[in-house]
Amino acid sequence: MAEFFPSLTQCALVAAAFKVLLFPAYKSTDFEVHRNWLAITHSLPVQDWYYEKTSEWTLDYPPFFAGLEWLLSKVAFFVDPAMLQLGNLNYDSWQTIYFQRSSVIFLELMLVYALNRYIKSVPAPSKHLAHAASLSILLSPGLLIIDHIHFQYNGFLYGILILSIVLARKQSTLLYSGVTFAILLCLKHIYLYLSLAYFVYLLRAYCLDPNSVFRPRFGNIIKLGIGVTSVFAAAFGPFVYWGQLNQIKERLFPFSRGLCHAYWAPNIWAMYSFVDRVLIPVAPRLGLPIKADALTSVTRGLVGDTSFAILPEVKKEHTFALTLFFQLLPLLKLWLQPNWDNFVGSITLCAYAAFLFGWHVHEKAILLIILPFSLLALKDLRYLGAFRPLAVAGHVSLFPLLFTAAEFPVKTVYTVLWLVLFLFTFERLAPVPARPRVFLLDRFSLLYDTVSIPLIVYCSLVHGWLFGGRMEFLPLMFTSSYAALGVVGSWVGFMVVYFTS
């Protein structure tokens, strides 16, 4: 890869140096969450991990991630043993901060490795496109904001996802793709949203004869079954033996939470909530009944606290049915045409469906769409046209995660520079499509991108000057609703591109 400048390695080193400078930056409660998990896995036997509740930040990730925390705790002991004490809540010595921040950067090497494998897997004429897409992922503002300031380990996890996607490119490594994805599911269960795409693709491309779906390849079925079963047995087997599977299920899937998170993720339910809010003042004139008990608690994201003042209530069953329906649509094409591009497209559309229609979706889950889509964004200008509003909306929607003044220049300047650099570069690199571009989608993207600037200025600066500490939810609602429009518009655009390609 020496012919490309800057190289992936060079960018990774510069990015790591920049991230070290952010060590003293704002950190969210997720920092304490992971410190507490270090303490749990270090201090207690394995069978007690999912029962410990000294802190409110209980262990709610699958066993492999708990095992990763256990490994990190062995190193943490030599850095500052105090961070591993269960009762030492909200402990954040500088040694603890530096260790946990460094662990995020170190584990992100998985992403660098996966992107390097991705570039190597692409045919020579398209390697420059893969290189550009890989740099956009490595330098993603989303990963910078969520992992290196807010604090999480998404770079490591998405590295495993991308590696699994790359392994699915060749028939000879399809088995390893399925096993790698199984490992990912045992690290973080949010990737279950993508599991149907993997199931259909592996079934169609690996387990069944390419010339006839009625001729199964029994050898491949057995190998895949043994591989995937072995992974899940290693992760959950001990807990099944101890009779703790139900306890793990309660921790991993806390369905008592409300429809929307405290800050509305930019999805269909954010738009639904916005319409409900807008209808409240005009409801008496329209003769619409108002639920008085919902006026002060509309979708604040608290446990059991999801209610609408005007519009009908949304139940878990509704969100599940909508998510499943809109995931099945792209899977039909994947079943009929099981190639790698359709596989990545179906992963992206499954992520869209889960994000747009899912129950209690976090805004951080937008990366589940952006990063896989990045692998297809440069296929041609039609794909890029659908990607542009997603890139803008997805990254702007993350701004409320960092609400302190010190981080405002970092998140704003870095994100704007990334958008300008990569979207303009992508526009020059993306091939002209064989089919004509969608005129309305192009105009929508241009108008949508333009509106983002005044929105950022208002929400970050003007609102505080006008209202002080009042109406604090207004800029959040504007940001979420604006971003939701972009994500939905991008989804519709990509659905058109996917089914007409």
From Swiss-Prot:
Signal peptide: none annotated. Pfam families: Alg6_Alg8. It comes from the Eukaryota. GO terms for cellular component: endoplasmic reticulum membrane. Residues 1-3, 85-142, 204-220, 276-319, 361-364, 411-412, 468-476 are lumenal. One of its GO terms (biological process) is protein N-linked glycosylation. This is Dolichyl pyrophosphate Glc1Man9GlcNAc2 alpha-1,3-glucosyltransferase. Belongs to the ALG6/ALG8 glucosyltransferase family. Its EC number is 2.4.1.265. Residues 25-63, 164-182, 242-252, 341-342, 388-389, 434-446, 498-501 are cytoplasmic. GO terms for molecular function: dolichyl pyrophosphate Glc1Man9GlcNAc2 alpha-1,3-glucosyltransferase activity. Pathway: Protein modification; protein glycosylation. Keywords: Endoplasmic reticulum, Glycosyltransferase, Membrane, Transferase, Transmembrane, Transmembrane helix. Its main location: endoplasmic reticulum. The keyword RNA-binding does not apply. The chain crosses the membrane at residues 4-24, 64-84, 143-163, 183-203, 221-241, 253-275, 320-340, 343-360, 365-387, 390-410, 413-433, 447-467, 477-497. It is found in: Endoplasmic reticulum membrane. It comes from Coccidioides immitis (strain RS). Dolichyl pyrophosphate Glc1Man9GlcNAc2 alpha-1,3-glucosyltransferase that operates in the biosynthetic pathway of dolichol-linked oligosaccharides, the glycan precursors employed in protein asparagine (N)-glycosylation. The assembly of dolichol-linked oligosaccharides begins on the cytosolic side of the endoplasmic reticulum membrane and finishes in its lumen. The sequential addition of sugars to dolichol pyrophosphate produces dolichol-linked oligosaccharides containing fourteen sugars, including two GlcNAcs, nine mannoses and three glucoses. It is a multi-pass membrane protein. It is an enzyme of class 2 (transferase). It catalyses: an alpha-D-Glc-(1->3)-alpha-D-Man-(1->2)-alpha-D-Man-(1->2)-alpha-D-Man-(1->3)-[alpha-D-Man-(1->2)-alpha-D-Man-(1->3)-[alpha-D-Man-(1->2)-alpha-D-Man-(1->6)]-alpha-D-Man-(1->6)]-beta-D-Man-(1->4)-beta-D-GlcNAc-(1->4)-alpha-D-GlcNAc-diphospho-di-trans,poly-cis-dolichol + a di-trans,poly-cis-dolichyl beta-D-glucosyl phosphate = an alpha-D-Glc-(1->3)-alpha-D-Glc-(1->3)-alpha-D-Man-(1->2)-alpha-D-Man-(1->2)-alpha-D-Man-(1->3)-[alpha-D-Man-(1->2)-alpha-D-Man-(1->3)-[alpha-D-Man-(1->2)-alpha-D-Man-(1->6)]-alpha-D-Man-(1->6)]-beta-D-Man-(1->4)-beta-D-GlcNAc-(1->4)-alpha-D-GlcNAc-diphospho-di-trans,poly-cis-dolichol + a di-trans,poly-cis-dolichyl phosphate + H(+).
